[in-house]
A protein has these predicted regions:
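A beta-strand edge to alpha-helix "cap/lid" segment located at domain peripheries
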Residues: 2-37, 48-138
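Helix-to-beta-strand junctions that scaffold the AdoMet/dcAdoMet cofactor pocket
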Residues: 43
């Protein structure tokens, strides 16, 4: 019997779990407004990019990190309830699609997000985040 297929499946499961954990760490850092934890999740490079709802795309870790500093200095913290999360791992890249259901003192809403991760020597790092507001259902 060939155990290589089982080994590949175990590797895939471990990678998927690691990507899910890194994705969760991103949202935990966001909720806590923790710049150090947010920095730990991201790849610090020129290829990092971030598109917050209503913003243009930011390129490079400097611009991305500055955006988190500005957002964390905002009026009220956010709580995320994540739904419809799907994870795909292909080699050294992975992506998560997820609906971010937001709760804040100002109200809430839903953002459809895509988070792109790359494998680094010490784990998975977020290299791109894109969030688009979802129109409220009537």
């Amino acid at each position: 019997m060939d155990d290589s297929a089982d080994d590949d499946h175990e590797d895939d499961s471990a990678d998927e779990a690691a990507v899910r954990a890194t994705n969760r760490a991103f949202y935990d850092a966001f909720e806590a407004r923790d710049l150090d934890a947010m920095s730990d999740v991201w790849e610090h490079s020129d290829r990092s990019s971030c598109t917050h709802p209503g913003w243009g795309t930011l390129h490079g870790w400097g611009a991305v990190s500055a955006s988190w500093f500005a957002l964390f200095d905002g009026p009220s913290p956010l709580q995320f309830i994540l739904t419809d999360e799907a994870v795909e791992v292909q080699g050294d890249a992975a992506w998560v699609t997820v609906d971010e259901n937001l709760i804040s003192a100002e109200g809430g809403g839903t953002v459809a997000a895509v988070n792109l991760f790359v494998r680094a020597e010490d784990g998975w790092r977020l290299v791109a985040h894109h969030g688009s507001a979802v129109a409220p259902q009537s």
